[in-house]
Amino acid sequence: MILSKPNYIKIYGHRGARGDLPENTLESFKYLFKNNINAYETDILISKDLIPVITHDFRLDPSFTKDNEGNWITDENIIIFDLSYDELLKFDVGSLNKLSRYGRRFVNQKTLENQKIPKLSELLELSSKNKSENLLINLEIKSTPDEENLTPTPEEMVKLVMKEVNKSNLQNKIIISSFDWRTLTEIKNLYPEISRAYLSFQQQAGIKIKNTIYNRSPWMSYLPFFEKYELPKIIKSQGGKALHPYHKDITKKLVDISHQE
């Protein structure tokens, strides 16, 4: 939700257009633009040689990743940050194993041969060709305070990402989000002109995802937590542009507070 525009709704492509085409591939983003969807969310990690790349998970996902011989990978612990970009190019992420849990979820996703994990620079170059005034790019920086050696430091990640953003001249079209608010603190301190969105997850019964919202949480960059549903006040105090909560955490009270702020 964009706090300053309570009646504002925008249609986004999530990880490109993963319902129809392989997620986070250049072809998926091209497909969005061809269908007049001019806003998207995507994910950024860093390769071993410090190149920002477009991929969601810290590790290669066996459900849609094949090796250079065309076989599904079986190793679930191939860390993106352990591989150079040239090594990442050996993998094909253009098809979906329909027997996997992910594959059963997106049964209509088409296969595209020889799809590689793109660089952030490639995606921004593609996006710069979209002259729509409604272009909006949500870059989620994937970072975690809970596990070391999956990424550079938050400051290093932010500088690497912003180097590419500044080259693109798309600064006014970009909002940067993260569950790891340490990265957003770095953006605030180093690049205050860039819009920031704060991702959150509040524990729900029966869902095995770690809660990121609690007093002095490392996910929240150790900011004090006011009250359970007053995240908008915390974000406003940081000069943030938006709250991006887990969809099942959205309540009327949360929306009302957001609009008041």
Positions of the model-derived regions?
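Phosphate-group recognition and catalysis centered on beta-loop-alpha active-site segments
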Residues: M1-E261
